[in-house]
Amino acid sequence: MRKPYKVRDRGRAVFLLDREEFERWFRTAKKSLESAEGDAERGDYNWACFKSHQAAELSVKALLHGLGLHAYGHSVARLLREASNRGLSVPGELVDCARELDKLYIPTRYPNAWAEGAPFEYYTADDAAKAISASKRILEWVEDTWRSLEGELRRGGE
């Protein structure tokens, strides 16, 4: 069984760090982002957009699960709000990225999200590039935040 570690986040909150759980989820997020990039290269832009959303969702869930918190749902913006409610500093621009990605969760996959045609007919290389960029920003923030919390632990957090 994994042993979580306690850390103080600049005196505001106490978190339990579960590195193994964080890594399990974060590796999955990174693999999803790699898959999105491959889809974009092949011209499967709707799937690149969807997987960009998935990568961002999985990365924020990695952070929350790594902190011993519950992480439910698929809205990246809501998951970031949960992180913020728990004392983490979430930049507003990151929430904007999350909102853009949240718009891609359903219509990238389901024909009935559109009046006619199929999802793949509606997405472009530019859409995919923007989604991948937004997802990368969220993954970078998650990784930086995790490293900061681990640094607190190394510096003597409880």
Which residues make up each language-model segment?
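Terminal alpha-helical segments
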Residues: 1-158
